[in-house]
From Swiss-Prot:
UniProt-annotated binding residues for Zn(2+) 1: 379, 389, 455
Cofactor note text: Binds 2 Zn(2+) ions per subunit. Required for NAALADase activity.
Principal subcellular localisation of the protein: membrane
Family annotation (Pfam families): PA, Peptidase_M28, TFR_dimer
Name of this chain's protein: Glutamate carboxypeptidase 2
The species this protein was found in: Rattus norvegicus (Rat)
């Protein structure tokens, strides 16, 4: 079954004794290369003599042509034969397979990097479920214990049943309250408008709109003693499409798994801020960071129908609270009529366990700047088969590694070092990437150029979707103009053309939409904590016509290879396009003589964000005046940044690229700009989110928020206990933001 990985001699040999950046690796990969290469190659030879772009002018074209859709298809098939739950033998075996294949592909160094982190598993002998009990305490209904197996997978026995990872154990019972999506505003509606108290109740919420961990946190704050999560057809069933296996919709018994943590970037709950290695100090389980305090369990919509059909109490406040089930969506509390004495009971027996996980880290050393790292990473662990999440991304990473290895075997090397990562335990709170970044944080802060995330390659087949730092906007726009669009009706046109038409920006007329980085994926620690420029790209659905959350079969047993091959991307042309985008981003970042970062795009973004947060504040004009709140300092800092960025850009245009010292100075200014937005003290209550310009929303981890410190200070400010103190905090956050932008501008000034 899903037994946690046991320590073994082979695990030790491949794992802890091969920790990445160990002394031997440093000597092999960096000490000799850096000292000799820097002294002789950097100062004696012109910097562009040894770059691949000069030696092999067609290498970028060769790289893109070498990427093959059929290889991605083959890799995806291979990666989805068995489940790969973090901490299990299957996932360890896949790590060893990737380790061996990356070596065969030709990387200079491939190692396993292991950590002992807190994971969560269901109890095999005491399954989790939800029941309805009558007044005598007898069960009259219980939810399904497992999903039906998809065709062709009936004989695979190690499928973990649906559960909410890190839910505490417990058997709470009580009246049921329907809380819509369990968002902050939903609980405000219940408590402030409808006067419904959730304290001591069991609440049921539909998946969607916000991260499930935020739902659980909101339920806790409302006093609930348990929460049930379900996938409503309105959010996970597209009209006109059949359910799996005949289509890509969610069957009634399909269930979304997922963690319900609120880590806020802490990493392993027992070692927040520090790597979970062999000598790490670990908190007691009772002191673990980010764990929920109330039992949680997910169910499918067939079971949800049974729980909701006899709900009594208040009618839903408006149509936005109604889903796609044939129930009235009454809020409760409790059942109606003859069912009024029945209660709902959770039976949760999951357990937490310190378990070993394994990242795979591959290195392709740079020829000119081996001490500058461009990182491509995506996770490998899956809740079950992971047909989309994550293996559609892992297969693309595998093909990109193979392609870079092919070029290397022909004598090519990138200018800068490229690191490739197959992360473990992403589904349990981004643990693999966070622990590795924590272990190597000092090196990464000094040498990290960029991080490109490579989770799911598709969540639809409509158009490109990009989230990234403004530093990468121009890079993405330029490279998509060079790539062909895979979309029907855009034959002979560029990816940029189809992207711009299908997903236009709401902020910048005539440009495609690029979104802010939030969280919920492995770029978090690199961007939000370390300040390394980051980006991600994948193919997505038509969000205008398709209102479902994510894709319907997300984190269910039905996320199979066949789902992708039959319904989403039969020819794998969209996977290939995503490989080209991700690969080209890495290629440009690792190979361009001048880093392809655009600080002027950052200036434009800062101006937009400052205007947006100011407009939000002006919802309170009287208070702004009474408490003498001014945004003048922030707007002044943004104007200064804009002026300095313009002058910096002019120096880039005039740069003598044959002068290695000047080249290094300007590249370092570009590389460290993102770092300049990092506040070591972090955001209020979220010390591991340190980026002052961007952070995950406090109310939805998946979404990005600009000037998050100011935004959070303003949120629901009229209902704060101490209004005067709340407005002083707004003033403080404005000053922090203004200082940070001004300080960042200073890093771009010409070095005297």
């Amino acid at each position: 079954m899903w037994n946690a990985q046991q320590d073994s001699d082979s695990a030790e040999a491949l794992g802890r004794r091969q920790r990445w950046f160990c002394a031997g690796t440093l000597v092999l990969a960096f000490t000799g290369t850096f000292i000799i290469g820097f002294l002789f190659g950097w100062f004696i030879k012109p910097s562009n003599d040894s770059t691949s772009s000069v030696s092999y002018p067609g290498m970028k074209k060769a790289f893109l042509q070498e990427l093959k859709a059929e290889n991605i298809k083959k890799f995806l098939y291979n990666f989805t034969r068995t489940p790969h739950l973090a901490g299990t033998q299957h996932n360890f075996e896949l790590a060893k397979q990737i380790h061996a294949q990356w070596k065969e592909f030709g990387l200079d160094l491939v190692e396993l990097s292991d950590y002992d982190v807190l994971l969560s598993y269901p109890n095999k002998t005491h399954p989790n479920y939800i029941s309805i009990i009558n007044e005598d305490g007898n069960e009259i209904f219980k939810t399904s214990l497992a999903e039906l197996s998809p065709p062709g997978y009936e004989n695979i026995s190690d499928v973990v049943p649906p559960y909410s990872a890190f839910s505490p154990q417990g058997t709470p019972e009580g009246d049921l309250v329907y809380v819509n999506y369990a968002r902050t505003e939903d609980f405000f509606k219940l408590e402030r408008v409808m006067k419904i108290n959730c304290s001591g109740k069991i609440v049921i919420a539909r998946y969607g709109q916000v991260f499930r961990g935020n739902k659980v946190k909101n339920a806790q704050l409302a006093g609930a003693k348990g929460i049930i999560l379900y996938s409503d057809p309105a959010d996970y069933f597209v009209p006109g499409v059949k359910s799996y296996p005949d289509g890509w919709n969610l069957p009634g018994g399909g269930v979304q798994r997922g963690n319900v943590l609120n880590l806020n970037g802490a990493g392993d709950p027992l070692t927040p801020g520090y790597p979970a290695n062999e000598y790490a100090y670990r908190h007691e389980f009772t002191e673990a960071v980010g764990l929920p305090s109330i039992p949680v369990h997910p169910i499918g919509y067939d079971d949800a129908q049974k729980l909701l059909e006899h709900m009594g109490g208040s009618a839903p406040p408006d149509s936005s609270w109604k889903g796609g089930l044939k129930v009235p969506y009454n809020v409760g509390p409790g059942f109606a009529g003859n069912f009024s004495k029945q209660k709902v009971k959770l039976h949760i027996h999951s357990y937490n366990k310190v378990t070993r996980i394994y990242n795979v880290i591959g290195t392709l050393k740079g020829a000119v700047e081996p001490d500058r790292y461009v990182i491509l990473g995506g996770h490998r662990d899956a809740w079950v088969f992971g047909g989309i999440d994550p293996q559609s991304g892992a297969a693309v990473v595998h093909e990109i590694v193979r392609t870079f290895g092919t070029l290397k075997k022909k004598g090519w090397r990138p200018r800068r070092t490229i690191l490739f990562a197959s992360w473990d335990a992403e589904e349990f709170g981004l643990l693999g990437s966070t622990e590795w970044a924590e272990e190597h944080s000092r090196l990464l802060q000094e040498r990290g150029v960029a991080y490109i995330n490579a989770d799911s390659s598709i969540e639809g087949n409509y158009t490109l979707r990009v989230d990234c730092t403004p530093l990468m906007h121009s890079l993405v726009y330029n490279l998509t103009k060079e790539l062909p669009s895979p979309d029907e009706g855009f034959e002979g046109k560029s990816l940029y053309d189809s992207w711009k038409e299908k997903s236009p920006s709401t902020e910048f007329i005539g440009m495609p939409r690029i979104s802010k980085l939030g969280s919920g994926n492995d770029f978090e620690v690199f961007f939000q904590r370390l300040g390394i420029a980051s980006g991600r790209a994948r193919y997505t659905k038509n969000w205008k016509n398709n209102k479902v959350s994510s894709y319907p079969l997300y984190h269910s047993v039905y996320e199979t290879y066949e789902l992708v091959e039959k319904f989403y991307d039969p020819t794998f042309k969209y996977h290939l396009t995503v490989a080209q985008v991700r690969g080209a981003m890495v290629f440009e970042l690792a190979n361009s003589i001048v880093l392809p970062f655009d600080c002027q795009s950052y200036a434009v973004a800062l101006k937009k964000h400052a205007e947006t947060i100011y407009n939000i504040s002006m919802n309170h004009p009287q208070e702004m005046k009474a408490y003498m709140i001014s945004f003048d300092s922030l707007f002044s800092a943004v104007n200064n940044f804009t002026d300095v960025a313009s002058k910096f850009n002019q120096r880039l245009q005039d740069l003598d690229k044959s002068n290695p010292i000047l080249l290094r100075i300007l590249n370092d200014q570009l590389m460290y700009l993102e770092r300049a937005f990092i506040d070591p003290l972090g955001l209020p209550g979220r010390p591991f989110y340190r980026h002052i310009i961007y952070a995950p929303s406090s109310h939805n981890k998946y979404a990005g928020e600009s000037f998050p410190g100011i935004y959070d200070a303003l949120f629901d400010i009229n209902n704060k206990v101490d209004t005067s103190k709340a407005w002083r905090e707004v003033k403080r956050q404005i000053s922090i933001a203004a200082f940070t932008v001004q300080a960042a501008a200073e890093t771009l000034r010409e070095v005297d």
